[in-house]
Amino acid sequence: IRQTSRRLREKNDTDILRQTSVTTASGELTLAGLYALASYPQGSRPALAATAAVILPADAPGRHQNLQTFDGPLPEMLSDMLRWTERNLPTTAYYGDDGNLRNAPIIPLAMVREIIANALVHRNLGPYTLGLGKSIQMRILPDRLVIESPGGVIGLSIHQLESSEHAQAAVNQRLYNIVRHLRTPDG
């Protein structure tokens, strides 16, 4: 962050953490700081976890398979959820230009990563979701990926959502400001 903000370039670590809302003035982690950086934010906020499962067809014996709960800081959850999705997403076979048969997920992984990242970063962190234990739910069905993220779309109109023009509204501005400076192994 020192490289991107001349205002913070000369600040010490404590001041930077406070001024970027990672910590409070007394040094305690904020909710955004906890979710983004703590080793196990689910200890004090269990709803910050996410679950994923492959939903079986109605005629199959059982409801789901490969149920997994994801925890840890937001960047690690993103990486773990993406790896799980890559393992469980159905694939299609196609012949490449070189004549070799290849398998590709039914949804491009770059798109999946963006969807998961948006669900994690833009989820509602208010008392009516966290306090009620609402967490992110990801489900793979035979023909689609469904991600339910607590809360709603705040700051965007239906017209903006339906438009091809880019519209942006950070639901959790402090969290977004923190995680935009973080990196995962895949970027």
Give the ranges of each region predicted by the language model.
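Active-site "cap" helix and flanking loop/linker of ATP-utilizing ligase/carboxylase catalytic domains
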Residues: 171-174, 178
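Active-site helix-to-loop segments that bind/position phosphate- or nucleotide-bearing substrates
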Residues: 1-130, 136-145, 149-169, 182-187
